Amino acid sequence: MTGLPDQLRRPVRGMRDWMPQQLYALRRMEEVLSSVAEQYGYRRVETPVVEHFEVLAKKAGQEVINEIYYFRDKAGRELGLRFDMTVPIARVLSYNLDLPRPVRWYYFSKVFRYDEPQHGRYREFFQFGVELIGSASPRADAEVVQLLAASLEAAGASKYVIRINDRRAVDKLLESLGALSHRDAVYRALDKKLKLPREEVIGIMTSGGLPRDAAEKIYDTASEMSLDEAVEVLRRLDGRLGEAYAKFVKYLEAAVPLERFKFDMSIVRGLDYYTGVVFEAFVGDYWLAVGGGGRYDDLLELYSGVKIPALGFAIGVERLMEAVGLQSVEKPLDYYIYIFDDDAYKHAVALANRLRKQGHSVVVELGEKNLKDVFEYVLKIGTRYLVLIGRKELEKGVVKIRDLQKRGEVEVPLSALLS
């Protein structure tokens, strides 16, 4: 038999297999991030991977709609794989309106996007995130941004910056320039400002008819500044917006130092459901974008008919793992028990069960390898102790335990290990 052709042995394009060392690294990140969310009073939630397509497309925007894994099931229903967790959570809240608010939920879940795979980016990937639902307070904004920073630090990000904006500020700027009708083109351009040269970004804005001088004004205004400087900029654009932003900055500064945060009007986020404060996190020497979020005060009304303010963030887990250098975690076997003959098997199994009850990982040799092969095998898989049991050891009432790290060997009474 020739087996499967090579392309069928590999995962579907954009997907990945998780080998044990990689999966243990993922689980470590899951434990770290979940612990931070729990400490802030958030509780874990999960939803089905499959959603009605209409639910996913409700406020996604055409670019995201094009990335949805879409299909019809055997009953003819139009379905899709979730592309984030915010939309499914909004749907869950739509039939749980009696929950006490604010609701604080978090997740660590698989999501799917049919975009072009590239290094570090897959079509199936994990997101960690939080949603704070039922509060319009700037304290809620500050809490979620603080939680994002705490999550990055807990994950091992020693170098990071969180860039913050408010979509209403961009709209006020466009209004002052008489350019609100060009909003979509401007948002598209600003979303690419950190990735493309100045002329290309301005070209995207002017391609829809926006005058060049207005495009240049928008580009130059959308520059990085401190949060304190941003308060004054926003006050000049709109007094009420500036005062609201000043409160947000005050509450954030009360919780964390502000040097990790910058105001950047080019941060608009690609999803169409954001309505206010938006932010993105960049990590490491290459400032890898690992996640972001913002306020989406209109989204829940689309599903429930009730206006409920909300905000949250999502982190691309694999991107964060790459940024902090967490690619694999070795988990060596604690004990490998080798027996020289069948008479020792029942003693080996009894010892293995005893050690497992104590929390150790234990393997008993299946009788297909000689001692030389076993030595090679246990070193390759990573093992701390090799236990040897044979007729001579049983006659003496002992087992031999070889420490494969320190390269020492001792005899230990079998009764002491079993008691």
Curated annotation (Swiss-Prot):
Subcellular location per the Swiss-Prot or TrEMBL entry: Cytoplasm
Gene Ontology MF term list: ATP binding; histidine-tRNA ligase activity
Keywords: Aminoacyl-tRNA synthetase, ATP-binding, Cytoplasm, Ligase, Nucleotide-binding, Protein biosynthesis
Entry's Gene Ontology cellular component terms: cytoplasm
Entry's EC annotation: 6.1.1.21
Enzyme class: ligase
Listed GO biological process terms: histidyl-tRNA aminoacylation; L-histidine biosynthetic process
Pfam families reported in the protein's UniProt record: HGTP_anticodon, tRNA-synt_His
Reactions performed catalytically: tRNA(His) + L-histidine + ATP = L-histidyl-tRNA(His) + AMP + diphosphate + H(+)
Keyword Cytoplasm belongs to the record: yes
Keyword ATP-binding: yes
The organism's place on the tree of life at top rank: Archaea
Subcellular location, principal: cytoplasm
Family of this protein: Belongs to the class-II aminoacyl-tRNA synthetase family.
Protein name according to UniProt: Histidine--tRNA ligase
The organism of origin for this protein: Pyrobaculum arsenaticum (strain DSM 13514 / JCM 11321 / PZ6)
Lineage: Archaea, Thermoproteota, Thermoprotei, Thermoproteales, Thermoproteaceae
Gene: hisS
